[in-house]
Amino acid sequence: MLKQRTIKSIVKTVGIGLHSGRKVELTLRPAAPGTGIVFSRVDLPTPVDIPASAMSIGDTRLASVLQKDGARVSTVEHLMSACAGLGIDNLYVDVTAEEIPIMDGSAASFVFLIQSAGIEEQNAPKRFIKVTKPVEIRDGDKFARLDPFFGFKLKFTIDFRHPAVDKTGQELEVDFANTSYVREIARARTFGFAHEVEMMRELGLARGGSMDNAIVLDEYRILNNDGLRYDDEFVKHKMLDAIGDLYVVGHPLLASYTAYKSGHGLNNALLRELLAHEDAYEIVTFDDPQSAPKGFAFDTQTAFA
């Protein structure tokens, strides 16, 4: 059977929160089959466990924020994206603040951390959410949509009227049957505009933001000396975010995702719409890994590249 996965050993790292600018300690721990991804605020007098789920996402203005019993864990999307990309089903994520550290602004640090811990298959079938009917959410000209598809592919279109973004492409389509998440998506960094960063800082946000963890643009160009990691890094980062946003549903999706100018809020609304229609999806497992869609049965020791 195609099995669930967790990590082999405990791994730790330290970083800063993008918005708070505060130091955050992050610990990843193995979890039993069927646990899911569970975030734990270990800094609180009584630690609060917040399982990743579509219904636990609260604030989505600047990041995906999980909330429960007054506790929050913000900016979960890059770590969730890494878990999706490496097929991690079960994991405990201990944090000492209300924000996951931003690291280098991409998912690469989390991929490296998970691969350093080692990936372990578990004796339980991996459960997928197979989309059986189209589901769509619209907000003005923005939209996000899931269609039935035997695998996982995404098509994302952004619309940033900026010369540097225009030059690198505003649209990307990826089918993970023949694309490596680690090589092609994981290293794409978050980006922002210098004037917005200044405004956010005045509001007490983006205190941890810098060119070490984001691509920063002025009105005309990229300000980072080292340029881009991918020719189309902007749209690739939006896709990285979407993969993480969608993975909070609790299982990998078997679906085709199409989006135009979507963000954390629309992605979460799409998941809620899907879950509201019981005839739009089913939970499936694969007794024979060979019968599963290509791309899900990759080697657990994929080299970081």
UniProtKB/Swiss-Prot annotation:
Keywords of the record: Hydrolase, Lipid A biosynthesis, Lipid biosynthesis, Lipid metabolism, Metal-binding, Zinc
Catalytic reactions of this protein: a UDP-3-O-[(3R)-3-hydroxyacyl]-N-acetyl-alpha-D-glucosamine + H2O = a UDP-3-O-[(3R)-3-hydroxyacyl]-alpha-D-glucosamine + acetate
Family: Belongs to the LpxC family.
Function summary: Catalyzes the hydrolysis of UDP-3-O-myristoyl-N-acetylglucosamine to form UDP-3-O-myristoylglucosamine and acetate, the committed step in lipid A biosynthesis.
Alphabetized InterPro entries for the sequence: Ribosomal_Su5_D2-typ_SF, UDP-acyl_GlcNac_deAcase, UDP-acyl_GlcNac_deAcase_C, UDP-acyl_N-AcGlcN_deAcase_N
Needed co-factor(s): Zn(2+)
Active site: H264 (proton donor)
Assigned EC number: 3.5.1.108
Entry GO MF terms: metal ion binding; UDP-3-O-acyl-N-acetylglucosamine deacetylase activity
Residue positions binding Zn(2+): H78, H237, D241
Keyword Glycosyltransferase on entry: no
Domain of life per record: Bacteria
GO annotation terms (biological process): lipid A biosynthetic process
GO cellular component: membrane
Pfam family, one: LpxC
Listed pathway(s): Glycolipid biosynthesis; lipid IV(A) biosynthesis; lipid IV(A) from (3R)-3-hydroxytetradecanoyl-[acyl-carrier-protein] and UDP-N-acetyl-alpha-D-glucosamine: step 2/6
Name of the protein: UDP-3-O-acyl-N-acetylglucosamine deacetylase
